[in-house]
A protein has these predicted regions:
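Surface-exposed helix-capping loop/turn segments at secondary-structure junctions
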Residues: 58, 119-130, 170-174
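Active-site-flanking alpha-helical
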Residues: 53, 141-142, 175
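GST superfamily/GST-like fold recognition
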Residues: 80, 85-89, 126-154, 159-165
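GST-like domain detector, emphasizing the conserved glutathione-binding G-site
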Residues: 1-104, 108-111, 118
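Long hydrophobic alpha-helical segments typical of transmembrane helices together
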Residues: 158-179
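Short, solvent-exposed turn/loop segments enriched in Gly/Ser/Thr/Pro and often Arg
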Residues: 6, 133, 178
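Residues at helix-coil transition
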Residues: 53-54, 122, 166-167
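Active-site rim elements
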Residues: 100-107, 125, 148-151
Length: 179
């Protein structure tokens, strides 16, 4: 089941949610069928993806070399793409005052990260070879490229990647969820 957390209404600060996600951030899950048959709460998108990948055996290779490749792109998203694009979006759209330095800095870093990804995708469909939890983590940020002042046509491999991932039936089902 999906329980929407409305961050504009400060739902993330409710005590029940803080028991699941002490960092008061989304996403967070509760797996009623966790390890040893006990419920487990998992917060942070990367941790959730790794947990579900290990549990299901899907989209998270067991071969150590392939797993490291997936993990480094997952960490790239968590430590670079997500935070920088989030700051780009914040300073470009939501900041109470326009701060040119912040806008320029995060726009430049966003473009640099798109270029890194565009280069990585030369000759391959997914960031780590096969579809993985890294791709699952990256896509939501790319879907907001227009809000990040990104001309997606400047990054043809990223544009094709977005189209390829968005065409996956499971991705279409996820994007159709209204919360």
């Amino acid at each position: 089941r999906i329980f929407p957390i409305n961050i504009l209404e400060n739902d993330q600060f409710q005590s029940d949610f803080l028991k699941i996600s002490p960092n008061n951030k989304i996403p967070a899950i509760v797996d009623q069928d966790g390890p040893r048959g006990e419920a487990i709460s998992v917060f942070e998108s990367g941790a959730i993806l790794q947990y579900l990948g290990r549990k299901t055996g899907l989209f998270y290779p067991t071969d150590e070399q392939k797993r490291v490749e997936v993990e480094q792109w997952l960490m790239w998203q968590m430590g670079g793409l997500g935070p920088m694009l989030g700051q780009n979006h914040h300073f470009g759209k939501f900041a109470k005052e326009q701060i040119p330095y912040a806008i320029e800095r995060f726009t430049a870093e966003t473009k640099r990260l798109y270029k890194v990804l565009d280069q990585q995708l030369i000759g391959q469909d997914y960031v780590a070879g096969e579809y993985s939890i890294a791709d699952i983590a990256i896509l939501p940020w790319l879907l907001r490229h227009e809000l990040q002042n990104i001309a997606i046509d400047d990054y043809p491999n990223v544009k094709n990647y977005i189209e390829r991932l968005s065409a996956r039936p499971a991705v279409q089902r996820a994007l159709a969820i209204q919360v």
